[in-house]
Amino acid sequence: ETAYGGGTLAGTEPDADITGMTIQALSPYYGERDDVTGAIDRALDWLSETQLASGGYGTMGAETSESAAQVIVALSSVGIDCAKDSRFIKNGKWPMPGLFQYYLPEGGFMHVAAGAANNGGGEAGTLNGMATEQGMYATAAYKRLLDGRTALYDMSDTTLSAGEVVDVSTSN
C-alpha cells in the first residue's frame, strides 16, 4: 500500500491494476478484519479519485481496458455496484462503459484504443488476448454481483453437471 492508498508493483506511485488486484485478493476479509477493511477503504478512495472522465482507468501513462477490468472485479468482490455508487461515476460514466469502449465487433477487447498512447501492452486499436480475457471475466464478476451471487473467485455457489450450458449473458 502506498502513502496514497493505492497499490503498486514497484516504486511509490499507485497503479489501478495493482490496486484492483490487491482489493480482489483481500476481499474475503473485508468487513471481518479492521486492518484489511481500512486498507481496502483507502484503496477504494484512491480509485475513486483517479477514475478518468471516460469512467475507465489507466496504468503506466495510458488508459487501458485491463485497468477498468481489474477495478470492476475489485469493486464487485467487495459488493460495490459501480453503476450505482456515486464514487465510481464520473461525468455520468462508470467503469463498465469505461471497459466497453474497448469492445470490438469481432467479439473481444482492445488493450488501448486506436491512436492512443501505447504503454507496451499490445498494439493500439486491435483485438488483444489479455484484454479480452480480463474484459470477459470482469463482465462475469459484475453479472455475478447483479445476480446476488458470490464474488468471481468464490464459486462456492456454483454447481455444474456434465454437459450443462450456463447462461453468462449480461442482460437481466
Question: Language model features by range: what are they?
Answer:
Residues 1-41, 52-92, 104, 108-147:
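An alpha-helical repeat/solenoid feature that recognizes helix-turn-helix modules
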Residues 150-172:
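Intrinsically disordered, low-complexity repeat and linker tracts
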